[in-house]
């Protein structure tokens, strides 16, 4: 298992969040487009700006759908890999919290009754056991 495979779910979730923020910004822009509030260059009508914003919104929504489909495939695949390569139940739980649920080490420690430092130590030991190169 590679570090990229471990972080795939986290990366997809970040990309989805960024795309959702982009859609929110595009919708805000579309709502504020008027000739009185924002001067537009000659030849650019409000209608064409709205069409451009609508097209960008549709493209971004399609990107989100694609990312969510990839995420739906990545979660079970990563869970399966973790369960296959990590044999201790507590270690499996830690890895699933970290890489599937995308929890912070502090939160994992709280959920599992460990100190944050202990979570880091156990995590490091697991990575060494499964020979993940984090560089």
Where would I find each of the regions flagged by the language model?
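N-terminal interaction/assembly modules
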Residues: 1-84, 132-135
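N-terminal positioning helix adjacent to the helix-turn-helix/winged-helix DNA-binding module
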Residues: 74, 78, 89-91, 122
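Short amphipathic alpha helix immediately N-terminal
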Residues: 87-101
